[in-house]
Amino acid sequence: MQDTAHEQIRKETWSDPWSRDWFIIEQLVSRDFKLKFRRSFLGVLWSVLNPLLMMVVMAIVFTAMLRFSSSSIPSFPLYIILGNITFTLMADSTTYGMHSIIDNASLIKKVRINRFVFPIEKVLFALVNFSFSLIAVAFVMIFVGIAPTGFALLLPLFIVYVGTFCVGLSFLLSAAVVFFRDIMHLWTIVLTVWTYATPLFYSEEILPSWFRNLETFNPMYHYVNFIREILLYGRMPSLELNFACIVCSLISLALGWFVFSRHEKRFILFI
């Protein structure tokens, strides 16, 4: 008996491992998106409102209360929100990704599936939320009177840079936390320290020279600068900045994939 059209499509799709993995990733992203905003009155609007509200709070604290100002920053609110959404993208990606293997333990035990899809899916889910945050950025740009330039078209390149970096970190953390659960608590502390070590809510001009030199080794410093260059300052990121972003992304991906692929066969024994 001939296969039905539905069965034929299913066979053709699942005969290709990459198509199968991508299908699984799509389904997981859809599931997480629905779960996040389930029973929420404003739903996806929170992805727009949250960075806006955070920007307002930080702008008040650093300008009105701490009297911070810098002539080199065209718009402090835009400066804040760009730093905030970039760091939030990394923090959410890695936190979700870190839990991705142990949270899907039952599925991994029952179904033969490539385990790398779980950390990647969490990063893609965070990127979906990030895309809604860009709506908030557009509102702020309109409010402060800064028009996007042609360099805003480099935003997809920024997403590739930071997305690759987050995938690598998620590979590393998701593998490590299978064997050492304490990493979940340590990572929260690391993110807190990392937040204040990165010029998100303050200008790097206030940092001592020795600390500014250390920022060279801070990947998020480079990614935050990249998005500010194209959306806040409206100019082409330097070759040095692009090189730093590429190096950080590739090192993260290589290290994360090495650790993940080397230990993934043992996950089933510890989850």
Regions found by a protein language model. Give the residues of each.
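Hydrophobic transmembrane alpha-helices and immediately adjacent juxtamembrane helices
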Residues: 1-271
